[in-house]
Regions:
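Non-catalytic cap/lid and distal C-terminal segments of serine-dependent acyl enzymes
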Residues: 31-310
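Generic short N-terminal amphipathic or hydrophobic helices
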Residues: 7, 19-20, 266
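Compositionally biased, low-complexity segments
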Residues: 6, 28-30
Length: 310
């Protein structure tokens, strides 16, 4: 029985010059200043993917003032669903639309099927990681008034989606300013038939290959983190992840392990262990925190014009 407690592990170890810049930089709150909760709008887009060879839908939560502020560009949070779920889960099983209404940012919820958000080991039509980075994100930037730069982009998710989000933050630091996870399945590349038995095993092998495969190694968040150089670490986004103390060991233990490696590597992050399990009640509660931190780390909306890419 794991002890019920709340733990926050937070570490900031940037060079002094960077710390001073952050200390004296102006803040850009994304929260609505009116005090009342505005009404957001939700759209569903059908995107034809060449990399997955399928039409993949995604939902978009637009800020309340998106239609009226014709020249404003907004930061974007990409919110990934879990295994066995779909793009609609966040909207139908949590109150994320209500929570997002407090912030002036766009929230995109893509379809990831059971892909683990990786480019699969078998088949040319399982390139979901490439789809997210090379097709989905450009499509969102084309359709909506987004801030098309690192400081205007974040990624987060639950379970399978939490794994994908943290991995993207580690692999693509120039793309995201924040990466967050709730109940992240970080140990997935170690899974055997014991964890993914029955009908799930064969599809899982097509994605990751057998234990020790190159695909598993390339998508192992522990190995990716251990291999980071000091220079690479300095470029990383801010990380947040949490896990319920009543979650299964296959989720809880890897979360604590990953935070330990982050501490060893001096990677700024926040890790929390909170009462709860692998459930929608827990995820509905914690997505509020993900939105709050994402809003803190992203740049505020800005008037349209020349967008600086950095």
């Amino acid at each position: 029985m794991k002890q019920r407690f709340s733990q926050i592990l937070s570490l900031v170890v940037r060079p002094a010059a960077f710390a001073i810049i952050m200390l004296f930089s102006p803040t850009y709150p994304l929260a609505s200043a009116s005090g009342s909760v505005p009404i957001v709008s939700v759209e569903t887009i059908q995107l034809q993917s060449k990399l997955v060879n399928a039409t993949l839908p995604y939902n978009v939560i637009l800020p309340a003032d998106y239609r009226t502020s014709k020249t404003t560009r907004y930061p974007v949070l990409y919110l990934l669903h879990g295994l066995g779920g779909h793009y609609s889960d966040w909207l139908t099983r949590t109150n994320v639309a209500d929570y997002a209404a407090q912030y002036r940012m766009i929230v995109v919820m893509p379809e990831g099927n059971d892909s683990w958000y990786v480019d699969g080991a078998a088949g040319s039509n399982d390139k979901y990681e490439s789809y997210i980075l090379k097709e989905l994100m450009p499509d969102v930037d084309k359709r909506y008034r987004t801030i098309q730069a690192r400081y205007g982009r974040a990624v987060a998710g639950l379970s399978m989606g939490g794994y994908g989000a943290i991995k993207y933050g580690l692999k693509y630091p120039s793309t995201f300013a924040f990466a967050g996870s709730v109940s992240g399945a970080f140990g997935v590349t170690r899974y055997t038939e014991k964890e993914m038995g029955g009908a799930s095993w064969e599809p899982f092998l097509k994605i990751f290959g057998p234990v020790g495969s190159e695909t598993r190694k390339a998508n192992d968040v522990f190995e990716i983190t251990r291999a980071l150089t000091p220079g690479r670490i300095a470029s990383l986004p801010y990380f947040y992840f949490d896990c319920g103390t009543e979650d299964a060991a296959q989720h809880f233990n890897p979360n604590r392990e990953l935070s330990g490696i982050f501490l060893e590597k001096k990677i700024p992050h926040e890790y929390r262990e909170l009462p709860g399990n692998h459930s929608w009640a827990y995820w509905d509660q914690q997505v509020k925190e993900v939105l709050r931190i994402a809003a803190e780390k992203l740049r505020a909306p800005k008037a349209s014009g020349k967008i600086s890419h950095r």
